[in-house]
Amino acid sequence: LEDLEFALNRGAEIYAEICGFATTNDAYHPIAPAPDGSGAARAIEAALCDGGISPDQIGFINAHAASTPAGDVAEAEAIRLVFGERSGEIPVTSVKGAIGHCMGASGALETVTSVLAMMEQRIPPTRNYRNPDPAIGLDVVHDEPREASFTHLTKHSFGLGGQNACLVIGEAPANRRTSID
């Protein structure tokens, strides 16, 4: 990671740009998120605002989705609060089903996965997603990767004690790679 200006000046090969970032803490409960998703929604909204990106520009969501009933439903509520009617149309995935919950490393691994998905315009599936919860009501990519066309995504990390973080990632402004070496 480096400042975009420095990367451009040195002619670096740029894979993506972190357009916005925000953290919040809803302090709802030591281990459970606010069930209405309000704390997570504030993080997503603040990250979009930080990046000057409209919710309408988001074409993919890499969810925290740790497969906890309370956490997943709260995250779905947060997505509905921020994206409104579009929330059921934006492809959502989580790589935890494929790689497990890597705790402190999860955010970094999921960010790399998000960047690769954007570069390839191909969203990885949520592995081992067998019994959809009707309370989620989102367009969860499962079974097979999905071809997609998007320029911006959100990457969510929501943790114990109501810690909420969101990255807004956009296509590289210059030197965009077209495939992975």
Model-derived features with residue positions:
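Conserved beta-strand positions
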Residues: 60-63, 155
